[in-house]
């Protein structure tokens, strides 16, 4: 597996440049610093996930929608709906039918079943009653029903992978079907809680922290900030006290609730209380709404998704029904004895005391608002608020106990408000006096401040993003969480983005490859063992963000990939190079070459047919020439070279891949230059020089075949000049006049008046200002001596006596007969000497070394006498060694 970065490296990430692909982007299109129209976008590694699509219950028309125009919805891969409440799901039909959204939508089975009826009823209510004089229809009932098939359902605790995004829903405990989603993108784990509850109630499974998963980012609600609720038993007692107080004075109790969710929990509480208090059983409990009746069937269907209390009631009532023998007896836990269902207020006989659970919970429109306007003027009546009240709604205003409330349903029923006057709209409002009592006892299925903080601490995510909360509540919770950082080694980062605000958080996740197949059987070194262990090589396969390392043979089984091996062949015909020369050239480039002998199978592959093989062997037998089997060598462990001596054909064979192709190209480059490169010519010349036992006709044949074997001195001299120009520039000229020996000595030593010899540096003290090599002697005598010397040099194969090299202000002379270098500058002299030696070795033997006696100076300017090349080469410390 890939090595993980050490802690020090991880901590230094913040100081390093961050790749945009390593940043998690979070956009709040709704639900930022507010409660309502929840909609969030997360982007990471090119993947986009949309969380919820709700509408604001306190707003109407387009203003109730999230800010969809601020984001390109066509880039969204998947949309996850946490639960069916309107502030989390009612904008979904608009997204699917009115926008360019192209992704997939997921929710749980129970959520979709209730969502169908809830949104359908919501569309009908909004189309029949509104506080606006000009209503805006965002989508129709047909839009809603036509988009239902686009919604896919998933079960709790099951993992699904969509476009390399892994999602797992967990019970959230908020309402039936409500889910927390664990989202994994490229190893980054994000937990979105939605609305969740950790409280033990009568029918739902409370939310728990996913086990065995390290959460990197937690996106959680902050509805109640840091405020805490009283214990559950105290709230139930307060609820019953408030309800019975109103009933005892002959009033009616209005409990505004969402049609589904907390309403079912309150019905269970009331049913249980009425069961134990016979004096109340004569007072009816009403649950009004056509949608509520239909959705109760869903609750009866998904008993298996509820907690043990509901399952116990189900088994108990099933046993009672079986014991009675009456099959008509209802046996479900949702078949109430004291709760009656009403389709509408038209069938409601408003006489005497009662308890009425009506929707919607925010009292904006609908049945609950109509009953509020009807019962508010009577001081014997009472309103009990049990859910969370969103800012800007009538439910929130009613908690302040105003003296008057605005009549909406009465105005719509009487037709008032449809004729607008030129005056202020405030003057046209119908106000109703409020004399009823108002109590608030929270049974909202949201975590309070203590439960939320404990959940965040248990998850231990390094990054927390707070949503779904009013700004002041959210900031109080943020301050509390940041205050806990003083006790932590790893500080928690808390973000509270507002609507349309972008948050970018850098994350660098280690890329971990899973080793599978044959490679998984390799024993890896333990921590106690020294060394890095064996080198593991294989094929790295990426499927989405998952990496797997496997042997090529396992690709079909573990990756589902079909493998194809491409064998490449290349044929090159050489005119004269032998296998020895080829091997020598390849070894100089690639190191040791492995000889693998002959390959009969390869020979068979080269033969096109059996008839051609027989014909070839017959011809070879007629010629009575013994067949030489091809020689095979392996270069770099991947390229096979076969040399056929008779045809001088070289065959290359290798398995095609990026690395092998590069090696094969390099081998072909060596083969294509093996007959023309100066180094190869020199090597072949060395081999041919000392084998005098070869037949002359064979040697002549090889010279004829090799175009470099018959090169003359002029060609070699031109190559020498080319190499020198590459090193010292173009200011290089041949020396036309040779060095002439003095008449008094056979050597070239110059003596001063005292009989001491002068060194070359003393003789060349004025060389940089002179351009010819003659001494002031008689021109006629000098011309004859020069002519004789030139003739002698030409006879030796030396085209010119020497070469003059000018570099800036310095001049160096090279005499080609003995390769002596003369220069007043020691650095340039040494440099020229080294280049000359390398050049002569490259272009092979230049010419014979003169046999006349010479004086060659060493580094100290002392004279060393010699009689030939052998003597010169044998002297230690020479500046120039003659090359034979």
From Swiss-Prot:
SMART domains: Beta-Casp, CPSF73-100_C, Lactamase_B. Residues 684-695 have a biased composition (Basic residues). Zn(2+) 1 binds at residues 83, 85, 174, 195. GO terms for cellular component: mRNA cleavage and polyadenylation specificity factor complex. Keywords: Endonuclease, Hydrolase, Metal-binding, mRNA processing, Nuclease, Nucleus, Zinc. The active site is at residue 446. It is an enzyme of class 3 (hydrolase). Residues 762-780 have a biased composition (Polar residues). Residues 742-758 have a biased composition (Low complexity). Zn(2+) 2 binds at residues 87-88, 195, 468. Residues 595-626, 678-705, 734-780 are annotated as: Disordered. SUPFAM superfamilies: Metallo-hydrolase/oxidoreductase (SSF56281). GO terms for biological process: mRNA processing; secondary metabolite biosynthetic process. It holds the Pfam family RMMBL. Residues 605-619 have a biased composition (Basic and acidic residues). It is found in: Nucleus. Its EC number is 3.1.27.-. The keyword Zinc applies. GO terms for molecular function: 5'-3' RNA exonuclease activity; metal ion binding; RNA binding; RNA endonuclease activity. The keyword Nuclease applies. PANTHER family: CLEAVAGE AND POLYADENYLATION SPECIFICITY FACTOR FAMILY MEMBER, CLEAVAGE AND POLYADENYLATION SPECIFICITY FACTOR SUBUNIT 3. Belongs to the metallo-beta-lactamase superfamily. RNA-metabolizing metallo-beta-lactamase-like family. CPSF2/YSH1 subfamily. Component of the cleavage factor I (CF I) involved in pre-mRNA 3'-end processing. This is Endoribonuclease ysh1.
């Amino acid at each position: 597996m890939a090595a993980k970065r050490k802690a020090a490296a991880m901590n230094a990430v913040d100081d390093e440049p961050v790749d945009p692909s390593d940043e998690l982007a979070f956009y709040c299109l709704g639900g930022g610093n507010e409660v309502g129209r929840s909609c969030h976008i997360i982007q990471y590694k090119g993947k986009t996930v949309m969380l919820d699509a709700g509408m604001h219950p306190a707003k109407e028309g387009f203003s109730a929608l999230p800010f969809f125009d601020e984001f390109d919805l066509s880039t969204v891969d998947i949309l996850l709906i946490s639960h069916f409440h309107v502030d989390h799901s009612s904008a979904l039909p608009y997204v699917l039918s009115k926008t360019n959204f192209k992704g997939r939508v997921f929710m749980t089975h129970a959520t979709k079943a209730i969502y169908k009826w809830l949104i359908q009823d919501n569309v009908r209510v909004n189309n029949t009653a509104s506080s606006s004089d000009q209503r805006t229809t965002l989508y129709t009932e047909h839009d809603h029903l036509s988009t239902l098939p686009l919604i896919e359902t998933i079960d709790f605790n099951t993992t699904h992978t969509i476009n390399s995004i892994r999602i797992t829903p967990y019970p959230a405990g908020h309402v039936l079907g409500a889910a927390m989603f664990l989202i994994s993108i490229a190893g980054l784990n994000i937990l979105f809680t939605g609305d969740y509850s950790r409280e033990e109630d009568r029918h739902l499974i409370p939310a728990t922290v996913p086990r065995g998963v390290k959460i990197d980012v937690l996106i959680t609600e902050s509805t109640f900030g840091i405020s805490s609720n009283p214990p559950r038993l105290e709230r139930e007692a307060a609820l019953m006290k408030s309800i019975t107080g109103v009933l005892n004075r002959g009033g009616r109790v209005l409990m505004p609730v969402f049609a589904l969710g907390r309403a079912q929990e309150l019905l269970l509480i009331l049913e249980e209380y009425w069961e134990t208090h016979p004096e109340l059983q004569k007072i009816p409990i009403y649950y009004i709404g056509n949608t509520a009746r239909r959705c109760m069937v869903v609750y009866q269907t998904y008993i298996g998704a509820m907690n043990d209390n509901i399952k116990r009631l189900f088994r108990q009532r099933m046993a009672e029904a079986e014991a009675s023998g009456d099959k008509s007896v209802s046996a479900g836990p949702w078949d109430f004895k004291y709760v009656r269902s009403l389709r509408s207020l038209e069938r409601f006989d408003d006489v005497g005391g009662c308890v009425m659970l009506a929707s919607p919970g925010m009292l904006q429109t609908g049945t609950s608002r109509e009953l509020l306007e009807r019962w508010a003027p009577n001081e014997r009546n009472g309103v009990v608020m049990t859910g969370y009240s969103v800012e800007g709604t009538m439910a929130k205003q009613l908690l302040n106990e105003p003296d008057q409330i605005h009549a909406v349903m009465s105005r719509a029923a009487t037709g008032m408000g449809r004729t607008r006057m030129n005056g202020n709209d405030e003057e046209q409002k119908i106000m109703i006096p409020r004399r009823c009592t108002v109590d608030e006892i929270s049974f909202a299925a949201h975590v309070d401040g203590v439960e939320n903080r404990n959940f965040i601490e248990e998850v231990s995510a390094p990054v927390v993003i707070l949503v779904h909360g009013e700004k002041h509540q959210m900031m109080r919770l943020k301050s509390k969480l940041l205050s806990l950082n003083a006790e932590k080694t790893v500080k928690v980062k808390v973000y509270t983005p507002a609507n349309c605000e972008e948050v970018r958080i850098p994350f660098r996740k280690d890329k971990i490859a899973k080793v599978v197949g044959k490679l998984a059987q390799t024993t890896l070194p333990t921590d106690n063992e020294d060394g890095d262990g064996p080198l593991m090589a294989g094929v790295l396969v990426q499927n989405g963000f998952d990496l797997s390392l496997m042997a090529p043979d396992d690709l079909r089984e573990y990756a589902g990939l079909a493998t194809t091996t491409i064998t490449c062949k290349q044929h090159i015909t050489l005119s004269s190079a032998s296998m020895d020369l080829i091997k020598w050239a390849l070894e100089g480039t690639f190191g040791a070459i492995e000889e693998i002998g002959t390959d009969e199978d390869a020979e068979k592959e080269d033969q096109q047919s059996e008839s051609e093989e027989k014909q070839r062997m017959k011809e070879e037998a007629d010629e009575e020439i013994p067949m030489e089997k091809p020689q095979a060598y392996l270069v770099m462990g991947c390229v096979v070279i076969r040399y056929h001596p008779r045809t001088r054909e070289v065959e290359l064979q290798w398995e095609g891949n990026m690395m092998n192709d590069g090696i094969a190209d390099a081998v072909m480059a060596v083969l294509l230059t093996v007959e023309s490169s100066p180094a190869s010519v020199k090597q072949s010349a060395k081999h041919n020089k000392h084998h005098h036992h070869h037949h002359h006709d064979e040697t002549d044949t090889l010279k004829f075949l090799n175009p470099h074997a018959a090169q003359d001195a002029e060609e070699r001299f031109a190559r020498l000049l080319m190499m020198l120009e590459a090193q010292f520039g173009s200011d290089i000229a041949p020396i036309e006049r040779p060095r002439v020996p003095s008449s008094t000595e056979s050597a070239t030593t110059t003596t001063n008046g005292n009989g001491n010899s002068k060194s070359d540096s003393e003789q060349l003290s004025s060389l940089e200002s002179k351009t010819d090599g003659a001494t002031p002697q008689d021109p006629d005598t000098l011309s004859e001596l020069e002519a004789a010397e030139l003739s002698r040099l030409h006879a030796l194969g030396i085209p010119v006596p020497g070469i003059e090299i000018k570099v800036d202000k310095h001049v160096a002379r090279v005499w080609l007969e003995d390769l002596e270098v003369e220069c007043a500058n020691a650095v340039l002299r040494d440099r020229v000497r080294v280049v000359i030696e390398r050049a002569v070795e490259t272009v092979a033997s230049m010419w014979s070394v003169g046999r006349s006696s010479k004086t060659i100076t060493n580094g100290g300017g002392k004279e060393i006498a010699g009689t030939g090349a052998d003597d010169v080469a044998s002297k230690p410390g020479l500046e120039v060694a003659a090359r034979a």
